[in-house]
Amino acid sequence: MKMQSPKMEQEEVEEERMRNKWPWMKAAQLMEFRMQALVYRYIEAGLRVPHHLVVPIWNSLALSSSSNYNYHSSSLLSNKGVTHIDTLETEPTRCRRTDGKKWRCSNTVLLFEKYCERHMHRGRKRSRKLVESSSEVASSSTKYDNTYGLDRYNESQSHLHGTISGSSNAQVVTIASLPSARSCENVIRPSLVISEFTNKSVSHGRKNMEMSYDDFINEKEASMCVGVVPLQGDESKPSVQKFFPEVSDKCLEAAKFSSNRKNDIIARSREWKNMNVNGGLFHGIHFSPDTVLQERGCFRLQGVETDNEPGRCRRTDGKKWRCSKDVLSGQKYCDKHMHRGMKKKHPVDTTNSHENAGFSPLTVETAVRSVVPCKDGDDQKHSVSVMGITLPRVSDEKSTSSCSTDTTITDTALRGEDDDEEYLSLFSPGV
């Protein structure tokens, strides 16, 4: 039996006391306890807790069965204020990209992120559509609230910085206003605004140089046609060609494309504004000034109708039938249907002074001559002449005002002849 020092014996006694007071912890529990103590030291020092120390604690909280322990531990260990059990992720180191159903990415997340390297920035580039190569040049205009600048090219930054550093007070250069600018022949005149961030040693802000010039493009390969530009005082600086030597064909094409597109939009708006009856949307289709399909001074798209048979009468029954006769010259209907329905608008007024007397205004003008045998002493035959007999008014309740005048006269004349026969029968010999 080995002899132990009094100090070692005292330590063993203390260990036995601790064993009796506290139960033994497992190896995993002891490791977790040490990690928690290390996390506490980070928090006490005011430093950010490393990710590899927090993840095992999250896993242990998720696998734990005690809800109270989960609640208190999550509220203590989370520096973002996580107080609910549902917010805890069962696999915090796994990427959260899913398809909305069962699939989930199995890659490991990045440090302090929720997604892996593959799915980290997914979907950001979909917000802008890639139309043409020129749209990429024009897309940077919205970033600085100006048209496209040359800030992407490193050479332009070096040249601009070397030129502007000489005179820091000159912030805006307008070449068109300077007397030294010379002109060229057959040149398009666009405008260009160049936005550039200068070095912090010169200026901490942004210097905008608006350049509107007369002669920008003669050909695609042509150089700048602007003379020497004095920036301040009597000093002479390099020309615009040396100012921006890296102006490429791509930039020139972008400027020309923007100018042509603007002119095209202006031309279309003028066409719509000045549109009249004879100038419509569809070329080759012109409307008559008197047509009902077109109103003067405005163009209605729903009023445009194409007639397959322009020379045919347009009278229809509203379904399938249509008149087959030819129209009159300069009209839409034939001679039969031209004035149909016009008399219905003005009904004939038959009321006059003869209605009060009960007699018809019509009088039989024809002389009715008949030979009536009369018996007298001499057995002579006398001829009786009946002329201008005023006929009583015959009212036909069934007749309407739309009937023609000829029909009314005929009906009245027929009824008048019947009355004449009754009147002449009085002179017959049998009476």
From Swiss-Prot:
UniProt domain WRC: residue ranges: 89-133, 307-351
Tissue expression profile of the protein = Detected in the shoot apical meristem (SAM) and in young leaf primordium.
Q: Where is it found, in Gene Ontology cellular component terms?
A: nucleus
Could you tell me the keywords of this UniProt record?
A: Activator, Nucleus, Repeat, Transcription, Transcription regulation
Q: Name one Pfam family in it.
A: QLQ
Family matches, as InterPro entries? Gln-Leu-Gln_QLQ (IPR014978), GRF (IPR031137), WRC_dom (IPR014977)
* Chief location bin: nucleus
The UniProt induction remark is: microRNA 396 (miR396a or miR396b) negatively regulates growth-regulating factors (GRF1-4 and GRF7-9).
Subcellular compartments: Nucleus
Task: List where the motif Bipartite nuclear localization signal lies.
Answer: 94-104, 122-129, 312-322, 340-345
Which ranges carry the QLQ domain?
24-59
Q: Which GO terms describe its biological process?
A: DNA-templated transcription; leaf development; regulation of DNA-templated transcription
Q: Which GO terms describe its molecular function?
A: ATP binding
Present the record's domain note. Answer: The QLQ domain and WRC domain may be involved in protein-protein interaction and DNA-binding, respectively.
In UniProt terms, what function does this protein have? Transcription activator that plays a role in the regulation of cell expansion in leaf and cotyledons tissues. Component of a network formed by miR396, the GRFs and their interacting factors (GIFs) acting in the regulation of meristem function, at least partially through the control of cell proliferation.
Q: Which family does it belong to?
A: Belongs to the GRF family.
Its subunit composition reads: Interacts with GIF1.
Q: Which PANTHER family match?
A: GROWTH-REGULATING FACTOR 5 (PTHR31602:SF8)
Q: Output this protein's name.
A: Growth-regulating factor 9
